């Protein structure tokens, strides 16, 4: 819809930061010497694809494609949204399916079938902060894990394709779609492999908790907005207390899952987070586990409070032991979910 396109463009109105990645990444290269193909030439070609010198800026011509698969809210959705369950019903659902955070911490698995489309209104009335936080994490955790699993699957497919000398038309079409999705020109493999990566679960949970007050904010309740992303032209919620002339709003989403996907796509494409992606790529290159407490240092531009925002996120991660969830994967309950592992 027109509203969705306006929302899409609004995410990229922040000033661009012309910071380049200056570290090469070492990947194992598999080159098959075919008849008539010069081995050295083929090796050099693959080296150029895999070992770039910098991540390029987002292609402005492709900005509209970045959020094309995300279900933003529009007035057409009024009255057609999925059911909002109350807190008691959600808690009973989790109990019936034996879904609790203690078990998740132990097994490192979460059932993504426990997906909730909207936060319960009653979460604001839960007096116990411990109980409120637990319910919030139970609701948001499966959404983050599932979206990360999809990115991980795409990343695996990307490297499988790059390891081949000759690609099928289906593979070429897949690559073309991913270049669009990540705001890049066709053939920019280096930038694609840097951008196509996961966001640590602990970091995403901490940001969602901070931006929504553990699910109690008006933006989260009315617009399924877990990460406070702004829009200047699209459908959104106007923050209270802002100047009348202020044009920005907080973007609304049809369901919570759409907010998670938009957040990940934003961190993976916006020029403000190029240093975040650089550090993440370095951790990958060194075969390290993604460290949210290091990566969070590169999110000072996510909020106007800068370093203070970073300090708050670190505190949330540590106090709530959120890094326990960084290794959590999708529980294989069906053939569909098995493919995400």
Walk through the language-model features, giving the residues of each.
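Catalytic cores of secreted/periplasmic lytic hydrolases that degrade extracellular macromolecules
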Residues: 1-206, 210-341
């Amino acid at each position: 819809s027109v509203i969705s396109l306006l929302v899409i463009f609004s995410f990229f109105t922040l000033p661009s930061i012309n910071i380049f990645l200056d570290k090469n990444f070492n990947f194992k290269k598999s080159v098959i010497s075919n008849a008539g193909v010069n081995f050295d030439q083929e090796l050099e070609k693959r080296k150029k694809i895999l070992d770039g010198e910098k991540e390029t800026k987002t292609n402005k011509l492709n900005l509209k494609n970045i959020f094309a698969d995300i279900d933003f809210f529009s007035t057409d959705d009024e009255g057609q949204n999925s059911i909002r369950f109350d807190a008691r019903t959600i808690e009973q659902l989790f109990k019936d399916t034996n879904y609790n955070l203690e078990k998740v911490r132990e097994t490192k698995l979460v059932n993504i079938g426990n997906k909730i489309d909207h936060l319960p209104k009653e979460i604001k009335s839960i007096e116990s902060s411990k109980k409120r936080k637990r319910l919030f994490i139970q609701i948001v955790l499966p959404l983050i894990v599932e979206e990360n699993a999809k990115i991980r699957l795409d990343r695996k497919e990307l490297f499988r394709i790059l390891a081949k000398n000759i690609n099928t038309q289906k593979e070429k079409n897949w690559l073309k779609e991913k270049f669009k999705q990540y705001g890049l020109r066709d053939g920019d493999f280096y930038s694609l492999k840097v951008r196509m990566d996961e966001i640590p679960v602990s970091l995403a949970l901490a940001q969602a908790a901070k931006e929504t007050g553990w699910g109690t904010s008006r933006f989260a309740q009315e617009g399924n907005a877990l990460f406070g992303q702004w829009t200047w032209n699209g459908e959104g919620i106007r923050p209270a207390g802002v100047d009348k002339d202020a044009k920005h709003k907080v973007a609304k989403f049809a369901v919570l899952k759409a907010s998670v996907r938009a957040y990940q796509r934003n961190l993976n494409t916006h020029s403000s987070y190029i240093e975040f992606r650089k550090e993440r790529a370095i951790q990958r290159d060194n075969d390290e586990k993604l460290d949210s407490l290091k990566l969070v240092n590169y999110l000072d531009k996510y909020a106007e409070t800068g370093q203070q925002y970073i300090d708050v996120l670190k505190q949330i991660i540590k106090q709530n032991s959120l890094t326990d969830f960084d290794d959590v994967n999708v529980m294989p309950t069906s053939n569909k979910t098995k493919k995400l592992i």
